[in-house]
Amino acid sequence: LECNQLIPIAHKTCPEGKNLCYKMFMVSTSTVPVKRGCIDVCPKNSALVKYVCCNTDRCN
């Protein structure tokens, strides 16, 4: 699986076991991602941050 990094033109191949791509947003600015990458399980959203996860190459 390949996931985008914070700068969308940069991407990396995920290590074994991390088979989801994610985007993390601050809830207050939910249109601008603050972090992107590979992750093993999709974290729960909280009062401050929102995660969007997907499982296809560079879908984040």
Curated annotation (Swiss-Prot):
Free-text function comment from the UniProt entry: Shows cytolytic activity on many different cells by forming pore in lipid membranes. In vivo, increases heart rate or kills the animal by cardiac arrest. In addition, it binds to heparin with high affinity, interacts with Kv channel-interacting protein 1 (KCNIP1) in a calcium-independent manner, and binds to integrin alpha-V/beta-3 (ITGAV/ITGB3) with moderate affinity.
Tissues expressing the protein: Expressed by the venom gland.
Record keywords, A-Z: Cardiotoxin, Cytolysis, Disulfide bond, Membrane, Secreted, Target cell membrane, Target membrane, Toxin
Family of the protein in this entry: Belongs to the three-finger toxin family. Short-chain subfamily. Type IA cytotoxin sub-subfamily.
InterPro entries: Cytotoxin_Cobra (IPR003572), Snake_3FTx (IPR003571), Snake_toxin-like_sf (IPR045860), Snake_toxin_con_site (IPR018354), Toxin_cobra-type (IPR054131)
GO cellular component, one term: other organism cell membrane
Subunit structure, interactors included: Monomer in solution; Homodimer and oligomer in the presence of negatively charged lipids forming a pore with a size ranging between 20 and 30 Angstroms.
Disulfide links within the chain: C3-C21, C14-C38, C42-C53, C54-C59
Molecular function in Gene Ontology: toxin activity
GO BP term (any one): killing of cells of another organism
Origin: domain of life: Eukaryota
Pfam families listed in its UniProt record: Toxin_cobra-type
Name of the protein in question: Cytotoxin 10
Annotated localization: Secreted; Target cell membrane
